[in-house]
Amino acid sequence: MTTTGNSLDRRSRGKLLSGIPARYAHFGSLMLLGTTAGTLALMSPQRANAFNLYSGTVNNQNVEINLETTVEYSTFYRVNDPSDVLLNNVNGDEGDRNFRHGFVDNTFDALPVLDMKYGNFGAHFSGELYLDTPYLGTNKNNSPSTYNPYTTGKNTDFTSATRNINGENAVLLDAFVYGGANFGADDQQTATLKVGRQTLLWGQSLFFASNGISAGQAPLDIIKAQSLPNAQAQQIFLPVGQVVATYQPNQILTFQAYYQFEWAHDTFQGVGAYFSSADILDKGGERILVGPASDPQVAALYRIKDVSPPIDNGQFGASVQATVGLYDLGLYALRYDSKAPSLYDGAPMPNGQANNVGSYWLVYPRDIQIYGASVSTDVGPANVAGEISGRRNMNLVGDAPFASATYPGSANAGALYPVGDTLAAQASAIYASAGLPLIPGGVSYAAEIAMNHLITVTANREMLAPGRQGTAAATEFTITPNYFSVLPKLDISFPIGITYDFLGRSEIDQTMNHGTGNFSFGVSATYRTTWIAAITYKDYFGKADVSLNPIADRGYLSLNLQHTF
C-alpha cells in the first residue's frame, strides 16, 4: 500500500475509530486499497466538506481552489493519582508532579487545508494553530530538588521549549506541488511528480507505526500517539520535504521512488508535559541529575548540542507494487536515518554551573536499511493484510547513556550504541458486519498483531539493555458498534479499543514490553458529517515501572468537540 498526501492534524484528540480505518478512509474508496496514490486522480485528495473558493475553466483546463478548515476543542481530566514508583524517578517525574490531579489539557485547535488544481497540476498546503492553556501558566510541581530544567528559575514554570511544543504554536504541515500526465496507447500510462513537504507511506501498518516498513519514511508524532485513543499508523506520521516520482505503465504495475531533502526527528513530549516520562530529552531537556536529590547543589550532566544527521546524508527508497486479481502486492527497499535518539555522555563543558560534572547529548543513528514486502486481499467480507521486513544496521535498545571519550561521538561507523539486523512482521484484518439485533448499524472490527525479532547483533553487544529478549509481540484491536440515523443526520458509535504486549521485552522497540498496554472506550456522535462530539475514557495495563511502563498512571477522561467547514 502507498499512502501520500495530506497529513492529519497533529493533536486531534477525541477522534475515535468510526469503523472505517485510515487504510480505507484516507482514500475514501475501498477499491483503492493497495494501489498507488500517484495516479492523477489521487494527487489532490477530494475533501467532501471543503469550501469552494473558485471553480472554472482557464485555457481549457479545469481550475479549482478549495479550502477546508477544522476547528476543535478538547479537554482531559486525570483519573489516577501519581504513582510513587514514578515520582521517585528524579529524571522522569516532572509530568506527574506538574499535573497531579484535575484537568491536564484544554486545547483549542484549527487546521486549515488549501487545495489548488489546474488541470493535472496543483498545490496542497496544510497547517495547524493550537493553544493548550495549562502550559501557558504555572504548574503544580512541588519538588524543586528534583526539577531538571535550570533555565526557568522556578519549578512551577514550564520551559519555553515545552510551552512552544505543547502550549501554543503555528505549524506548517504539508506544502507540496504536483504534476502529471497520461500517455501511451489510450493514455493508459501515468507519470506523476510531487515535490515538497508531504507524507509517503509504504506497507500495511494499521496500528504499530514504529514496527512497519513506513517507520523509515517519516517522523512520528509521539504527542498525538499518546493522546489519541487507538491512533492508527497513518494518523501519527509527519510530513517531510521530499521528491516523489510515480510511474504506472498499466493497471497492474506501479513503480515509485522518493528522495528526502529534509530530515526531522520524532516529535516528543516537552519536558514536564502530562504524558512526558523523561525530563532529559528533546524539548525542555536541560540536565540529568546524578547526585542526591536532597543536595541543593545536586550534581548534574548538562545538555549540549545534539548530533543530527546531515541533510545531504541521503534518505531514499524505491518500490514495485502490483494488483494481481484480488491481491495487492508490494516490494520495498529504503535507506533512512533514525528519528529517535540514543543518549551519549562525556566530560563537562564550561557553562558556569558549579555542579556541572559532565555533559550529555542526543545522537541520531544513521544509514539504516529496510527491505520488505506486503500483501493485501479480501477474505470473504473482511480485508486481510500483512507485511514483513528486515532491517540492517538497526540501533537496538541499549543501556544508555553511552560514555563517549570525545564530543560529538559517531552516529555511524564506530557507534557506541548496540547495532544489529532485525526482522519485523505485522498482520491485520478489517471487517464491518451487517446490521445485528440491537445494533442496526452493525459492528466494525479492526485488529493487528505485530512482532519483531533480533537476528544478530553486529556491534556493541555488551551495551544491550539487560533483561530484554530477542523476540517480542503485541496486538491491538478495536470494536465499534454503530447506530446510524438515530435522529435525522445523527450517527452514534461506541468505540472500544485494547492494546496489549503479550510476548517478550523487545530489544528493538523499548515500548514493547510484556504485560503492558492500554484500553479505551467511549461514545462518539456525528451530525451531518461535519460536527463530531466524543467522550473517551483511557487507562493502562500493568504496574508502573520507570523503564517498562512509565505512563501507567496517566489514565484520563476526555471530551472532544470538532467542526469542519
Show where each model-derived region lies:
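Outer-membrane beta-barrel "beta-signal"
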Residues: 530, 551-565
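Extracellular loop and loop/strand-boundary signature of outer-membrane beta-barrel proteins
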Residues: 94-100, 159-164, 228-231, 273, ...
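Short loop/turn motifs that connect adjacent beta-strands in outer-membrane beta-barrel proteins
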Residues: 49-67, 80-82, 114-123, 136, ...
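Outer membrane beta-barrel
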Residues: 119-279, 474, 503, 512-517, ...
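Transmembrane beta-strands of outer-membrane beta-barrel pores
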Residues: 73-79, 129-133, 197-201, 259-265, ...
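Transmembrane beta-strands of outer-membrane beta-barrel proteins
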Residues: 65-73, 119, 123-127, 191-195, ...
